[in-house]
Amino acid sequence: MTEYKGVASGILNGMELEVRCFPDPVLKKPAEPVEEFDGELADFVERMRAAMQAHNGVGLAAPQVGVSRRIALVEHDGQSFVLINPRLLEQRGEQTGEEGCLSFPGIYAEVKRPAWVRVEACDERGELRVHEVEDFLARAFLHEMDHLDGKLFIDHLSPIKRGMIRTKMRKRAAAR
């Protein structure tokens, strides 16, 4: 993966961003912080948004499109969040719900997560924001933030369930 100016090469030349699927190694690599907030970053965020919407996703993290940077997007019920260099400040409660992932097409599993979170993150202009979200949005924020740490939703599952999903995804990858 060739990188420049804190984002990635090729993002401005009209190439469509491709969602990477497990077992692509970029998905397990902790992402690097974003250091430059400029027009290239804003363009990349918009290209990520287009890729997420094209796949009917609720969230997308930069590693899912092959860019190892701490950038994530979440959209739900008309709300849109850009999370750059996010940091979990506080969490409360507990919820269990079904999760899916664009990097695991057609795979869903019950995952336990906090019910409420406070997250600090920059937007694409570099402005620091604090988001307090609950229920589904808390789940989506944490799912995308996990991607930035090289953690996948299947890592929250029992070893047996995780192994079954890994095997299924590896077979799919081999068939491509």
What are these regions (language model features)?
Residues 2-176:
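Positively charged
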